[in-house]
Regions:
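Alpha-helical packing segments of well-folded alpha/beta enzyme cores
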Residues: 6, 119-122, 150, 216-219, ...
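Core AdoMet radical
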Residues: 50-60, 71-115, 129-147, 157-177, ...
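Radical SAM enzyme [4Fe-4S]-AdoMet core and its adjacent flexible, acidic
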Residues: 58, 77-80, 185-188, 196-369
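Distinct, well-ordered alpha-helical segments
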Residues: 148-152, 176-184, 245-247
Length: 369
């Protein structure tokens, strides 16, 4: 068979060793084997109903995470408009950090938006009957009026749709706003929340600009305790800066599992490839080895932990293997000296724009940085 370039992420994982499991397996496990067989046998010209759909209404977001960009965050776009482009980044071939990407959001909420109108027409006509899962991403979905419009539809049309609603959220809200969300979704038949974090305290707040870690952790607990959601999933974007406290962050997640149950919260470790200068692979080998050793110790300590799912342990193990065996984030990545130069260029400017201090927040990287 062939290896299309778009499949490179999974092949890098599977090439590490014969036991490595890539996302093409995890992304398929939500479907029964019968559905996968049916998809294999069905001609590509056939008219089929979608089973899952992921939609982004707009890019409105109060965060400006370091690994994000203006195409997905209005706060990032404001940074570029206010402070101008990031300069000196030779590996930013797609110009993620040079302009506000206004083409990513052509219409404001309330304006005539043919794309959103088409979605709601489709949803009302038959999608609400045939779709198994609708996942809303962003931006920050809870800052989009269209997300609340969809929640209102479910409340006003109870019993008409069995579609599972999955909502991405950074959970960066005060108690009043969080309670408003909880009460809004309580009548809905099936809601799951996906949230993101991959480090602890000041390091998490540095990476995910706009985050209050204490507030985030408290909101996670309130959501679980509310009983309004079926599950909460934590997506960890594995980048160069999170590794120093990732093991502690995983401890925090295990503590939640012990408190609320094995299935109340789950996590995945998703290895960052873009922007490639923020990949964990830009770190020098001695630092990678240090972090790899910490993860190995964490794995050994938790391998028989009753609260961990097999896929969670496998995600930790594949990250350990990735740090040991993979040398480049992807096939089009620049050579390592250029990526490391961009790393320093970016975070120097990031500190100036966001009022942060890399050396103070990541003292273990200071000598290398």
């Amino acid at each position: 068979g062939e290896r299309p370039q778009g499949c490179e992420y999974c092949w890098k994982i599977e090439d590490m060793n014969t036991h490595a499991v890539s996302d093409r397996v995890y992304k398929s496990r939500i479907y029964p084997i019968e559905a996968l067989d049916e998809a294999f046998r069905t001609p590509n010209s056939a008219d089929v109903n979608l089973r899952t759909l992921e939609i982004s209404f707009d890019r409105t977001c109060q965060f400006a995470c370091s690994y994000c960009n203006p195409a997905f965050s209005s706060t990032w776009a404001r940074d570029i408009r206010t402070n101008g482009p990031y300069t000196g980044l030779v590996s930013d071939g797609r110009n993620h950090f040079t302009h506000p990407h206004d083409h990513s959001q052509l219409y404001k909420f309330g304006e005539t938006n043919p794309y959103v109108e088409a979605f709601f027409q489709w949803w009302e006509s038959d999608l609400h009957r045939t779709l198994q899962e609708l996942r809303i991403t962003g931006g920050e979905p809870l800052m989009s009026g269209y997300t609340w419009q969809l929640i209102d539809w479910f409340k006003q049309n109870q019993g008409r749709s069995n579609t599972r609603l999955a909502i991405n959220s950074n959970l960066g809200y005060d108690d009043a706003r969080l309670q408003e969300f909880i009460e809004a979704i309580r009548p809905l038949p099936h809601v799951e929340v996906y949230t993101s974090c991959e480090a602890t305290w000041a390091q998490a707040e540095y990476i995910r600009d706009g985050l209050d870690y204490h507030q985030w952790y408290d909101n996670v607990q309130q959501l679980i305790e509310s009983g309004a959601i079926k599950a909460l999933h934590v997506m960890c974007t594995i980048n160069a800066l999170c590794l120093s406290s990732l093991n502690k962050f995983l401890d925090h997640l295990v503590a939640l599992k012990a408190l609320y149950g094995r299935n109340a919260v789950s996590f995945t470790l998703n290895i960052l490839r873009f922007p490639s200068f923020q990949s964990p692979l830009v770190l020098p080998e001695d630092i990678r080895a240090l972090y790899r050793g910490r993860l190995q110790a964490w794995y050994a300590q938790n391998e028989t932990n009753e609260f961990l799912h097999e896929h969670e342990l496998r995600h930790v193990q594949r990250l350990i293997d990735y740090l040991a065996h993979v040398q480049s984030p992807h096939s089009e990545a620049f050579d390592m000296p250029k990526l490391r130069n961009d790393f320093r260029q970016f975070y120097t400017q990031y500190d100036q724009r966001r009022g942060k201090d890399f050396r103070h927040t990541f003292p273990q990287l200071t000598d290398w940085y």
